[in-house]
Amino acid sequence: MLKLWAEYVILSNPVPGPLLGLILAILAPGAVLAQQCKGPVAPFLVQDGGIQAPLCGLIGDVGRGRALVAGRQGNCLACHAAPIPEQAFHGDIGPPLHGVARRRSAAELRLQVVDAGQLNARTVMPPFHRVAGLTGVRPDRIGHPLLTAAEVEDVIAYLLTLDGKPARQ
């Protein structure tokens, strides 16, 4: 499909060769990523203690990420304290999220959210974007990650804003 699209662009647009090459070089990786991200779980590569590239090449949204952290879908506040004062309950099982952007890189945070077990085999944090090897999953949830690739990137975008001290204790 990408080859046909490229041939169409070349034949139907009088763009100078070097410029067209640059355009295709910029667009082609996105098309490849889109093809790889058709399933429920995005492919990823763990390198240097993290997932260096955003899942599916997506850019997260801070507001949606904050809503996921505060809401029941992400349920992060069950274990972590975060600067979300409108929520009465903040857990203390996991480390506080205040200042997490100073302690962890985007790549480390991404792996922590996708599959924390790869960083710490004894963690109680669930894998939010893995489906293989899980037990005790409700039949209607088998094969479906807790968060989509886009939602993971939204959470990461929000966590990267948390570089300050706690708003409350």
At which residue positions do the language-model features occur?
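C-terminal capping alpha-helices of c-type cytochrome domains
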Residues: A107, L111-Q112, Q118, H129-Q169
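Short pre-active-site segment immediately N-terminal to redox-active cysteine/selenocysteine motifs
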Residues: R72-N75, P83, E151
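Bacterial N-terminal signal peptides
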Residues: G17-G30
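Boundary at the C-terminal end of the N-terminal hydrophobic targeting segment
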Residues: V32-Q36
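Gly/Gly-Pro-rich "capping" loops immediately C-terminal to redox-active cysteine motifs
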Residues: L55, L77, A81-D115, V124-R138
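N-terminal secretory signal peptides that target proteins for export/translocation
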Residues: M1-V15
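Extracytoplasmic/secreted proteins, especially bacterial periplasmic and envelope-associated proteins
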Residues: G60, R64-A67, P96, R104, ...
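Electrostatic cytochrome c docking/interface patches
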Residues: C37-G71, A167-Q169
